[in-house]
């Protein structure tokens, strides 16, 4: 269901997820978000996100949700207490498969930048069993199935 699976990320009722090495950022005079590789940053030498800055990020983990399991992404409480905001659009439908989660993140601090780096624990997934299988799964009708990396909005589809 989650690849790579790391038992050290398992909590009593959730699974921690980690930040991948690619983000999409806003740049002046360009309406589309631009790809930024943060793969060379580390915890000791992080990428700094300025106050109020919004970006999309991917998880390292790839998800292969069965037809009877959904999941919800939430920030780790430590990250929220540091000042991170999440747009709460992290619902993963049953049958969402072969995809990395794209997270909508923002530095909610007023005066101080916040650090990110690949591999940092950013959030956790809460998994939910569904009672009935859907007639048509997300693998057949979803806009974001099979996304192997961070993905901008496909809301126009």
Task: Give short role names for the model-derived ranges.
Residues 1-157:
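DUTPase catalytic domain/fold
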């Amino acid at each position: 269901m989650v690849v790579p699976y790391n038992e050290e990320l398992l909590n009593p009722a959730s699974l921690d997820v980690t930040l991948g090495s690619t983000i999409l950022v806003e740049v002046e005079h360009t309406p589309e978000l631009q790809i930024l590789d943060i793969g060379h940053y580390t915890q000791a030498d992080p990428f700094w996100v300025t106050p109020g800055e919004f970006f999309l990020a991917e998880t390292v983990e790839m998800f292969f949700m069965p037809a009877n399991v959904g999941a919800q992404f939430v920030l780790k409480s430590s990250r929220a207490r540091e000042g991170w905001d999440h747009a709460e659009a992290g619902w993963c439908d049953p049958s969402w498969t072969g995809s990395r989660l794209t997270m909508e993140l923002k530095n909610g601090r007023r005066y101080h930048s916040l650090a990110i780096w690949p591999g940092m624990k950013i959030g956790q997934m809460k998994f939910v069993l569904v009672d009935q299988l859907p007639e048509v799964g997300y693998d057949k009708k979803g806009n974001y199935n099979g996304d192997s990396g961070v993905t901008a909005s496909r809301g126009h589809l």
